[in-house]
């Protein structure tokens, strides 16, 4: 798929369907999470998930900050013919390094300050117990939620929008059926919903990683140069954070 010479209409609808599909399945499994927990735990269960919602906003926003910001500049450099000097790979590398740093900080922050954060987001003693139980499996794979956002953005700009959608779709489908299986047949309640979410994110991550074994892959990690200057990728990504948060 050639972004420079391909048919504009075909390219537009290919990328539109991929982006729409990803957003749709993300919305669906968020609703299913709420429905399953609500049926099992009652109103307190859905309220506990609402308390956790800001945590998702933060980690998704950080992933978009690196992914959207980095992938836009990556494509710009490649489209301008600068891919030969490896400048586009520099921005992919910078985005990966930035993602690792932000994921580590968010992970540590969540582990150390989980209780005060959830209380700040509105949990009382009853909701706090449920929210913390939901977060037990989620905390294990918490960085993957950031990496998935970053990888999906780069895959779409590396000519693999279908794989990015497949990654989100496969994780979402696993989450939907995992919610039912872990919550009801396994009688895990809100913990089961968290487990399904954690495993679904892992499935998405593994599916998107297959891109790096593909012949179509042009994403390369290189030795970073003038890394501080590459931080301008955050200027391209912060607008997306505003959309997600507000």
Which positions does each model-derived feature cover?
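Transmembrane helix-bundle signature of multi-pass secondary active exporters and lipid flippases
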Residues: 19-72, 138-145, 236-246
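Short alpha-helical transmembrane segments in multi-pass integral membrane proteins
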Residues: 1-19, 74-143, 185-246
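Hydrophobic/aromatic residues in alpha-helical transmembrane segments
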Residues: 33, 70, 113-114, 151, ...
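Small-residue-rich hydrophobic transmembrane alpha-helices
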Residues: 46-108, 145-164
